[in-house]
Curated annotation (Swiss-Prot):
Biological role stated in the UniProt entry: Increases the formation of ribosomal termination complexes and stimulates activities of RF-1 and RF-2. It binds guanine nucleotides and has strong preference for UGA stop codons. It may interact directly with the ribosome. The stimulation of RF-1 and RF-2 is significantly reduced by GTP and GDP, but not by GMP.
Chief place of localization: cytoplasm
Signal peptide region: none
Protein name per Swiss-Prot or TrEMBL: Peptide chain release factor 3
Organism annotation: Vibrio campbellii (strain ATCC BAA-1116)
Pfam families per UniProt: EF-G_D2, GTP_EFTU, RF3_C
Lineage: Bacteria, Pseudomonadati, Pseudomonadota, Gammaproteobacteria, Vibrionales
Underlying gene: prfC
Key words, A-Z: Cytoplasm, GTP-binding, Nucleotide-binding, Protein biosynthesis
Domain (tr-type G): residue spans on this chain: 11-280
InterPro entries the record matches: EF-G-like_DII, EFG_III/V, G_TR_CS, P-loop_NTPase, PrfC, RF3_C, RF3_dom_3_sf, RF3_GTP-bd
Length: 529
């Protein structure tokens, strides 16, 4: 029987990720969430002047230079009566694979939308991934301190394009230079906008009731009248917030504000901590695992090399699914069938690491990894479980990688295998030659790999074009047919970083022909870890 203290710890966990299109203001929101959670004293904005603070969650050198989040960071902080685990995900075009995998480790998501632009391409793609698990979504319409589109129009777009009903919780009063604040529909109060920057959280003035004459006085009669009119429309056209519909991903509560101006983020956090689910039941291949089970279980969704330049180590990020982690406990590393003792797990505040003494279902902990842990690995207190749904995506872009100094082949291979294990890039070794082919989902990943090979492995490498259009993992239940396929397709076959057989196609036509000629072979565009 689970004890009340443990159940209390699990029920106050809220584990969520932020998803958005690049430049919708995600990193700024992350900062301000941490600021309101008192996790940092000063929010560092990303694209600042030369001496500006760098954002707390962007801690790798290249991220600091470019002002983009390249890797997923994990930050934990208390808010209201909850303990929040925030997983920051790369917002830049090119880092989708890491982001997809991170979405498998959360119980809810915050979707950030630039209110001037509405629903953008990257947001659509990420929402497809959240759909697979019916993840509950809270929405924050950002940048109200700039000129934005008609809010009603943007809500319609979310409903039509993402298939979710929108229930506004707050509503903007003006925008751009005329932005005066928001009306909180649930609390029946107007919160007036005062711009706060960096680490200043402004005292806000609150006006009770929509018909309060003080509202006309503060925002002007004509704006007050038009807001009352708008709200009448909104109340008629939009559904009321329905908690059940939210929990199955059918309805999203919507908040308005400006992350840069420190305004509206706290309203959103209040809603998220009140409504988002505590850690949920999760499917393993063998059975469903409840978060409140006594016995520990967890899965690895990301591996990060060299988080600490002073220690050239790797950290495996593990989502705890059930039970409690205690320092020094023994666990079963299921894939290897090995008992391991974990005494030095870490908890995260982006880049600052502190030793974890206890962690509970819903928490993310870091395990020191010396090459034995892979993405998708499960750890339990004995039971052989395998959690499903942690995807690997076939790359869309390919380059041949070559050394400037041929004597460093060993270091190059080691670096590439480590980077592929953490999901930064995929590596393919053709069966018929000694080439090393790197595959990625976006161009920027190639730059990241070369930069990291240089700074972490002291290897200088350059890229060349390669005649590869796409790759597919190949599988077949019939060993004889697989052998025949291998014999006839030697020139197109390679092994990936995990030694899985892969078909490398110079053109899509070539791939289609191979699929026609070998109907018994399964050509897969995704592979579970």
């Amino acid at each position: 029987m689970s004890n009340p203290l443990f159940l209390g710890e699990v029920s106050k966990r809220r584990t969520f990720a932020i998803i958005s299109h690049p430049d919708a203001g995600k990193t700024t929101i992350t900062e301000k969430v941490l600021l309101f959670g008192n996790a940092i004293q000063k929010a560092g904005t990303v694209k600042g002047r030369g001496n500006a603070q760098h954002a707390k969650s962007d801690w790798m050198e290249m991220e600091k230079e470019r002002g983009i989040s390249v890797t997923t960071s994990v930050m934990q902080f208390p808010y209201n009566d909850c303990l929040v685990n925030l997983l920051d995900t790369p917002g830049h075009e090119d880092f989708s694979e890491d982001t997809y995998r991170t979405l498998t480790a959360v119980d809810s998501c915050l979707m950030v939308i630039d209110a001037a632009k509405g629903v953008e391409d990257r947001t659509r793609k990420l929402m497809e991934v959240t759909r697979l698990r019916d993840t509950p979504i809270v929405t924050f319409m950002n940048k109200l301190d700039r000129d934005v589109r008609d809010p009603m129009e943007v809500l319609d777009e979310v409903e039509n394009e993402l298939g979710m009903m929108c229930a506004p919780i707050t509503w903007p009063i003006g925008c751009g230079k005329e932005f005066k604040g928001v009306y909180h529909i649930h609390r029946d109060e107007t919160i007036l906008y005062e711009s706060g920057h960096g680490h200043e959280i402004q005292e806000v003035r609150i006006i009770k009731g929509l018909d309060n004459p003080e509202l006309d006085e503060k925002v002007g009669e004509s704006l007050a009248a038009s807001v009352r009119e708008e709200l009448e429309l909104v109340m008629g056209a939009c559904p009321e917030f329905d908690h059940e519909a939210f929990l199955v991903g059918e309805l999203t509560p919507v908040y308005f504000g400006t992350a840069l101006g420190n305004f509206g983020v706290d309203h959103m956090l209040d809603g998220l901590t009140e409504w988002a689910p505590a850690p949920k039941t999760r499917q393993a291949v063998e059975r469903d695992v409840e978060a409140t089970e006594d016995k520990f279980s967890g899965f690895v969704f990301k591996i990060q090399a060299n988080m600490d330049p002073k220690h050239r180590d790797r950290i495996a990020f593990m989502r705890i699914v059930s039970g409690t982690y205690t320092q020094g406990m023994k666990m079963n590393h299921v894939r290897l069938g090995k008992q391991v003792s974990i005494s030095d797990a870490v908890t995260f505040m982006a880049g600052d690491r502190s030793r974890a003494e206890h962690a509970y279902a819903g928490d993310i902990i870091g395990l020191h990894n010396h090459g034995t842990i892979q993405i998708g690995d499960t750890f339990t207190q004995g039971e052989a479980l395998k959690f499903s749904g942690i995807p690997n995506f076939a790359p869309e872009l390919f380059r041949r990688i070559r050394l400037k100094d041929p004597l460093k082949q060993k270091q190059l291979l080691k670096g590439l295998v480590q980077l592929s294990e953490e999901g930064a890039v995929q590596v393919f070794r053709p069966l018929q030659n000694n080439d090393l082919i790197v595959g990625a989902v976006g161009v920027l990943q190639f730059d990241v790999v070369v930069a990291r090979l240089k700074s972490e492995y002291n290897v200088e490498a350059i890229y060349e074009g390669v005649n590869v259009a796409t790759a597919r993992w190949v599988e077949c239940g019939d060993a004889k047919k697989l052998d025949e396929f291998q014999r006839k397709n030697q020139t197109n076959l390679a092994l990936d970083g995990g030694d899985n057989l892969t078909y490398i196609a110079p053109t899509m036509v070539n791939l289609n022909l191979a699929q026609e000629r070998f109907p018994d072979i399964d050509f897969r565009a995704t592979r579970e870890h």
